[in-house]
Amino acid sequence: MKYTEIMVRYGELSTKGKNRKDFIARLGGNIRKSLKDFEDVEIHPNRDRTHVTLNGTDSDAVINRLKKVFGIQNFSPMLKVEKTMEAVQAGALEMMKEQLKPGMTFKINTRRSDKEFAINTDTMNRELGGFILDNFPDNDVKMKNPDITLRVEIRSNGIFLTSEVINGAGGLPVGTAGKGMMMLSGGIDSPVAGYLGMKRGVEMEMVHFFSPPYTSEQALAKAKELSGKLAAYSGSVQFIQVPFTEIQETIKEKCPEGYLMTIQRRMMLRLVVALAKQRGGLAIFNGESLGQVASQTMESMLAINDVTTMPIIRPVVSMDKNEIIDIAKDIDTYDLSIMPFEDCCTIFAPPSPKTHPDLEKTRYFEKRIDVEGLLERSLAGVKITNIRAEENFMNQNEEVFAELL
């Protein structure tokens, strides 16, 4: 079916009162960013809905992009026809040939904003319904809960037909809740946490700790590609690569084995807070799930959080692993996440880390390292990459990977 327009309906934006205009403007901008490479597409936001004019662009490709734009409740692909009954019948016939199977029921639902159009809604419903029945004798009209509702919108600039309502991603437009810093490892949990934060309107920057030669180029490429998966929900994301080798080596050399993980996490948090202050971040996000590993007990969280007063948000904190995995599969990050490349959270991991670290002991052992000097040198080596939706990094490194095998 060659559709001419897609009508986008809003979700929670209807509750935003005086801020509604700003939310709609942000959503319009996010839709533009998502559809940037479709040069002929036009986006027209207004108070109640946004109209995406296709101008010959493949509707299926645009629909696949719109499904990942947060702030959209649902949308409908539409066919624009001339303002004559003959044109409406021809368009409806084409649409029903594709969608109305034998035995299915239907109804016509007409809205007429152009009151100068001669045919009123009742007449349109009756005449168009009769026309479809004549052409599809194996089908019946059903006014309540039909299989297909053919909607007819009579506007000043034409008549628009649609019979599909496609669910959107819901949530709030990315950017309406401010900026957050996502501590992105290569695992299953942190991409899901990033996705959930973005769904609540957070513009997320991905912070990844990289420890060569202990972590490989494959691990870095995997983290970048995971960021590309998440960028599909915002158009693009900033990927911040933070060198962490010296810090890990120093902690391993000077601190007790049981406290390695706790002190490493404190240093990570300090670095992310510093980046947030530089870049306008309002909160730190991570993929911690309570009790899942040693660093995710409440005692560990208390000892780690001690280094900052900035909010730390854990979107998956109360989820079971299977719940997190289900979301990871839905957003297409799971297969990437389980690729067996070590990240900096797994190297130097002690066999028996403290699950209930003492805060005072943590502070005492941490005094053995030059915290400020280590932070300064790490921040000096930060690299930032703008990553577009679904951008591929694993294939770019195929030759490097082959040499390592």
Curated annotation (Swiss-Prot):
Pfam families documented for this protein: ThiI (PF02568), ThiI_fer (PF22025), THUMP (PF02926)
EC number: 2.8.1.4
InterPro entries reported in the protein's UniProt record: Rossmann-like_a/b/a_fold, ThiI_AANH, ThiI_fer, ThiI_N, THUMP_dom, THUMP_ThiI, tRNA_STrfase, tRNA_sulfurtransferase_ThiI
GO cellular component, one term: cytosol
Enzyme class: transferase
Keywords: ATP-binding, Cytoplasm, Nucleotide-binding, RNA-binding, Thiamine biosynthesis, Transferase, tRNA-binding
Amino-acid positions noted as binding ATP in the UniProt annotation, renumbered to this chain: 183-184, 208-209, 265, 287, 296
Subcellular compartments: Cytoplasm
Primary localisation category: cytoplasm
THUMP domain location: 60-165
GO MF entries: ATP binding; CCA tRNA nucleotidyltransferase activity; tRNA binding; tRNA-uracil-4 sulfurtransferase activity
Gene3D superfamilies reported for this sequence: 3.30.2130.30, HUPs
Pathway(s) where this gene product acts: Cofactor biosynthesis; thiamine diphosphate biosynthesis
Chemical reaction(s) catalysed: [ThiI sulfur-carrier protein]-S-sulfanyl-L-cysteine + a uridine in tRNA + 2 reduced [2Fe-2S]-[ferredoxin] + ATP + H(+) = [ThiI sulfur-carrier protein]-L-cysteine + a 4-thiouridine in tRNA + 2 oxidized [2Fe-2S]-[ferredoxin] + AMP + diphosphate; [ThiS sulfur-carrier protein]-C-terminal Gly-Gly-AMP + S-sulfanyl-L-cysteinyl-[cysteine desulfurase] + AH2 = [ThiS sulfur-carrier protein]-C-terminal-Gly-aminoethanethioate + L-cysteinyl-[cysteine desulfurase] + A + AMP + 2 H(+)
GO biological process, one term: thiamine biosynthetic process
Function as written in the Swiss-Prot or TrEMBL entry: Catalyzes the ATP-dependent transfer of a sulfur to tRNA to produce 4-thiouridine in position 8 of tRNAs, which functions as a near-UV photosensor. Also catalyzes the transfer of sulfur to the sulfur carrier protein ThiS, forming ThiS-thiocarboxylate. This is a step in the synthesis of thiazole, in the thiamine biosynthesis pathway. The sulfur is donated as persulfide by IscS.
Family per record: Belongs to the ThiI family.
Protein name stated in the entry: Probable tRNA sulfurtransferase
Naturally occurring in which organism (per UniProt): Pediococcus pentosaceus (strain ATCC 25745 / CCUG 21536 / LMG 10740 / 183-1w)
